[in-house]
């Protein structure tokens, strides 16, 4: 029987996940109706809709995976974990594309590459979404391969019928999945980080340039920079929390019945929840639909 703190954190995790599923479901419905009405979506809304759909699935998979692992359905949980890996990689790449889209559209740098991207980025979005799916699929294949190897190691060490890991299989899980995370997730994180840095410099240059003209704090371009930076600040917070949680999880053994495991889960999915709130508030269509509902 889990301890009282563990039960409390389990309930909090479940409530956060359900709230986030409702939130992302709202985004899917609003943008889905927009797509049905116009038979098309603006490029940025395509990315946001894809993010909302992926996050909706991620929370559902996280609930199912933790439920299965709690009852020692380890092989089933490992299969669901492969789906989690696919969705999570997809989300990381979609977040990187959204950051790049904001950077290209809003930044005021005069580099020829940025000029070219500013005119082409909207047409490139469908291809970028396809790249995200491909990277997610590749990540799932790597994860499935790791599960197969680890299961063979568990069987060879004589562990059957439960979730017990031998020393060799546990070390393999730690190093294999940490290497997998670095390989598959560092690139979108790097792209995301570079985009944020460019946006920050662009905002600083714009504010300094316009300060002499004193347009006031409601200058449209300054507002656009500020709104994008608010969204991307939450994005990068989610990234940092996620990677810290990944390091913690890769250096510990079975922690399902420890409240620290659930604290880590709450941190990860609360970050996603807060990130989705910023997406709703920064998107005119979603913000308008939210005001009409409430």
From Swiss-Prot:
<feature type="glycosylation site" description="N-linked (GlcNAc...) asparagine">
    <location>
        <position position="162"/>
    </location>
</feature>
<keyword id="KW-0919">Taste</keyword>
<feature type="transmembrane region" description="Helical; Name=7">
    <location>
        <begin position="261"/>
        <end position="281"/>
    </location>
</feature>
<feature type="topological domain" description="Extracellular">
    <location>
        <begin position="1"/>
        <end position="7"/>
    </location>
</feature>
<comment type="function">
    <text>Putative taste receptor which may play a role in the perception of bitterness.</text>
</comment>
<dbReference type="GO" id="GO:0004930">
    <property type="term" value="F:G protein-coupled receptor activity"/>
</dbReference>
<comment type="similarity">
    <text>Belongs to the G-protein coupled receptor T2R family.</text>
</comment>
<keyword id="KW-0812">Transmembrane</keyword>
<keyword id="KW-0472">Membrane</keyword>
<keyword id="KW-1133">Transmembrane helix</keyword>
<keyword id="KW-0297">G-protein coupled receptor</keyword>
<feature type="transmembrane region" description="Helical; Name=1">
    <location>
        <begin position="8"/>
        <end position="28"/>
    </location>
</feature>
<keyword id="KW-0716">Sensory transduction</keyword>
<feature type="topological domain" description="Cytoplasmic">
    <location>
        <begin position="202"/>
        <end position="227"/>
    </location>
</feature>
<protein>
    <recommendedName>
        <fullName>Taste receptor type 2 member 143</fullName>
    </recommendedName>
</protein>
<dbReference type="InterPro" id="IPR007960">
    <property type="entry name" value="TAS2R"/>
</dbReference>
<feature type="topological domain" description="Extracellular">
    <location>
        <begin position="249"/>
        <end position="260"/>
    </location>
</feature>
<feature type="transmembrane region" description="Helical; Name=3">
    <location>
        <begin position="81"/>
        <end position="101"/>
    </location>
</feature>
<dbReference type="GO" id="GO:0001580">
    <property type="term" value="P:detection of chemical stimulus involved in sensory perception of bitter taste"/>
</dbReference>
<dbReference type="Pfam" id="PF05296">
    <property type="entry name" value="TAS2R"/>
</dbReference>
<feature type="topological domain" description="Extracellular">
    <location>
        <begin position="150"/>
        <end position="180"/>
    </location>
</feature>
<feature type="topological domain" description="Cytoplasmic">
    <location>
        <begin position="282"/>
        <end position="294"/>
    </location>
</feature>
<keyword id="KW-0325">Glycoprotein</keyword>
<keyword id="KW-0807">Transducer</keyword>
<keyword id="KW-0675">Receptor</keyword>
<feature type="topological domain" description="Cytoplasmic">
    <location>
        <begin position="29"/>
        <end position="43"/>
    </location>
</feature>
<feature type="topological domain" description="Extracellular">
    <location>
        <begin position="65"/>
        <end position="80"/>
    </location>
</feature>
<feature type="topological domain" description="Cytoplasmic">
    <location>
        <begin position="102"/>
        <end position="128"/>
    </location>
</feature>
<dbReference type="GO" id="GO:0033038">
    <property type="term" value="F:bitter taste receptor activity"/>
</dbReference>
<dbReference type="GO" id="GO:0016020">
    <property type="term" value="C:membrane"/>
</dbReference>
<feature type="transmembrane region" description="Helical; Name=4">
    <location>
        <begin position="129"/>
        <end position="149"/>
    </location>
</feature>
<feature type="transmembrane region" description="Helical; Name=2">
    <location>
        <begin position="44"/>
        <end position="64"/>
    </location>
</feature>
<feature type="transmembrane region" description="Helical; Name=6">
    <location>
        <begin position="228"/>
        <end position="248"/>
    </location>
</feature>
<feature type="transmembrane region" description="Helical; Name=5">
    <location>
        <begin position="181"/>
        <end position="201"/>
    </location>
</feature>
